Structure formats: structure tokens, C-alpha cells
Amino acid sequence: MNIDKYTIVGPNLNENQGLMTINGLAAQQNQYAPLAFANLLESVRPKRILEIGTALGGLTEFFRQISQEIDLPLDIVTYDITRHSWFDDLQAKGVADYRTKSIWENGVLESGICQESIDFIKQEGTTVVLCDGGSKKHEFNSAAKHLKPGDIILAHDYAPNIDVFDTQINGKLWNWC
């Protein structure tokens, strides 16, 4: 597994260190993300990833590349309310199933995650759920209700409150909240 090929843009947090490129696609990740995610995929070997919040698509591309490098068959479904033109090419190449719609049932946050995502999580084998959309706390709480034993749920860019963000995270791990 060659983690070195994933480049970081910007020499420090004040210059977007939290933005990296993967095959020319931007991913809003800090420099520790590639190794952490690669180790997770290699050690857990999940059957699928549900990504809530595609953003620019770089992290999705990274999941596909790592899964190919470690010979891991992996289904990836990713949701975002914004669709970029390059998602069509990535979907045609088999990177992921890009779904341009709300993760919420009928688009209503209070309704919980949509049934198709619940069905995806409940399939046999380990599912990794990455909560990285616009309401991580709600995404996490709603998706967690549907996890099977052994499934993993992650929240990206999460801080429990502004004080923790200001004192422990801002300028140290990432610089956005």
C-alpha cells in the first residue's frame, strides 16, 4: 500500500492543510487521514462503506484506490445534495454509487436516514458508515440505530462543543467547524 502518493496541499493549517488531493480530486482531510483509513480498511476489511457527504469526491476515490490495492471487494454508496460534473465519470469507472439527494427520509431530518441507506447498512458483512454531511450529530444518531454487531460508525470534523474545538482542535488538527 503506497500512502505517499496521496499529497497534502498547503504547508500549514493556515494555508489549507486540511485539503489534500487524490488523483486530482480534493478531499477535506488532514494529513493523518490516509494512513488511518487505509489501516482501517486493511484490518477490518468491510463489505461496504456508506458515506454521508461526498463533498468533492476525493475521499470516495481514496476508499476505492485503497480497496483495490489491498484486493478488497468493497461497495461504496455516497450521498450528497450537490452533484459535481466529474461524479458521472467516477461512477462510470465504478468508484462508487453517487446518490445526489438527501440522506434523510423524504428529505426531512427528523424522519431519520432513508430506507435505502438502512437496507444498505443491514446487508450481510461489516458496514462502515462515515458521517460527514451537514448534520453529523443527527447522521450519527440516526445511522447508529441500524448498525449490526461489528459495524463501524465514524463522524468527521466533529467536536462536542466550541470550547473543545477552540482549545484542542482549531489550528492543531483542522481549522474549520
Model-derived features: where do they sit?
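A short alpha-helical cap/connector motif
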Residues: 1-177
